């Protein structure tokens, strides 16, 4: 055991400059691209499934490795990567804390299980179904890693697209109705969050999560911002009375899609509510 932890410490020293979070985000998409460009060669369902399963398992073990490297004695964000995306406006900034790392591991653990389960629930266009799952894994991990509100929003909303396709193409008899209901409810629910993010940038001049923790926001704006974020997350959690899209989505989605929806996609809203709502409205949240 001692030798094992010594080995981990040595690797820790060498990996500090390695973009492990970006690797976790991008690896599923690389697997999806491989399946897309080798479609004619991977019509064999077993081959496509093994490629997707291998990709997701590598990501799972990479997340376990991240857990071993994670310093549990501090509450600070770790493995932070900060790169300019749009100068003076948006930075690609990712990092993890004690909450987000657990959701990342949950995501990488559930994804291979969903891929294993497709034998009985998916009988057509398996290649495209696996691509949708891998792309969705990229977006879900991106949500839990984001340290910029714009990046968080983009990953959050992008996750709707593969789930919309999973329900609409591979779902049950009422799949089209359920898919559009899911998409429209959750998309319209995000309008307030987008308005709130734009307002935060207008008030503070930044969407960087770490900087917002330090800056704070005038109390006269806090109630409105809190309400906007809470309303958006309430639709996606979902809470009564804006929960009516969920039963249809669960019933019509294939098994793997229903598992991803329940185990991870709904948790993204809860994570956002816990991690970000109080960030902009300390006093309102405490009240």
Predicted regions and their residues:
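Transmembrane helix-loop-helix hairpins at membrane boundaries of multipass inner-membrane proteins
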Residues: 11-22, 34-131, 210, 214
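Structural signature of hydrophobic alpha-helical transmembrane segments
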Residues: 19-27, 98-106, 150-159, 223-230
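C-terminal ends of transmembrane helices
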Residues: 33-41, 112-122, 165-174, 237-248
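Alpha-helical multi-pass transmembrane bundles of energy-transducing inner-membrane proteins
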Residues: 42-44, 131, 135, 139-217
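Juxtamembrane/interfacial segments at transmembrane-helix boundaries in multi-pass membrane proteins
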Residues: 71-91, 190-249, 270-280
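Functional transmembrane alpha-helices
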Residues: 97, 148-166, 235-280
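A short, hydrophobic C-terminal helix/tail in secreted or cell-surface proteins
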Residues: 281-287
